[in-house]
Each structure stands twice: as C-alpha cells, then as structure tokens.
UniProtKB/Swiss-Prot annotation:
GO (cellular component) term, any one: photosystem II
Complexes and interactors: PSII is composed of 1 copy each of membrane proteins PsbA, PsbB, PsbC, PsbD, PsbE, PsbF, PsbH, PsbI, PsbJ, PsbK, PsbL, PsbM, PsbT, PsbX, PsbY, PsbZ, Psb30/Ycf12, at least 3 peripheral proteins of the oxygen-evolving complex and a large number of cofactors. It forms dimeric complexes.
Lineage: Eukaryota, Viridiplantae, Streptophyta, Embryophyta, Tracheophyta
Function recorded in the entry: One of the components of the core complex of photosystem II (PSII). PSII is a light-driven water:plastoquinone oxidoreductase that uses light energy to abstract electrons from H(2)O, generating O(2) and a proton gradient subsequently used for ATP formation. It consists of a core antenna complex that captures photons, and an electron transfer chain that converts photonic excitation into a charge separation. This subunit is found at the monomer-monomer interface.
Transmembrane portions of the chain: 5-25
Species the sequence originates in: Huperzia lucidula (Shining clubmoss)
Keyword Lipoprotein set for record: no
Localization terms from the record: Plastid, Chloroplast thylakoid membrane
NCBIfam families: PS_II_psbM
Keyword annotations of the record: Chloroplast, Membrane, Photosynthesis, Photosystem II, Plastid, Reaction center, Thylakoid, Transmembrane, Transmembrane helix
The protein's name: Photosystem II reaction center protein M
Main location: plastid
Length: 34
C-alpha cells in the first residue's frame, strides 16, 4: 500500500493549523485574564 505523502501533509496541516491558531488565542486570553 503506497502512502500519498502530499495528501498526508495536507490533512495534517488542515488539522494542525486551526488547532494551533485556537490554542494561541486561548493562551493570549488566559494571559490577559491573569
């Protein structure tokens, strides 16, 4: 079974980018509350 590297990278970026973005927003709001 051949793994499509480009599809794997695209899926990883599609998941990691929104997760990292929301995590950064959470850290910023948490630091502002403190």
């Amino acid at each position: 079974m051949e793994v499509n590297i480009l599809a794997f990278i695209a899926t990883a970026l599609f998941i990691l980018i929104p997760t990292a973005f929301s995590l950064i927003l959470y850290v910023q709001t948490a630091s502002q509350n403190n």
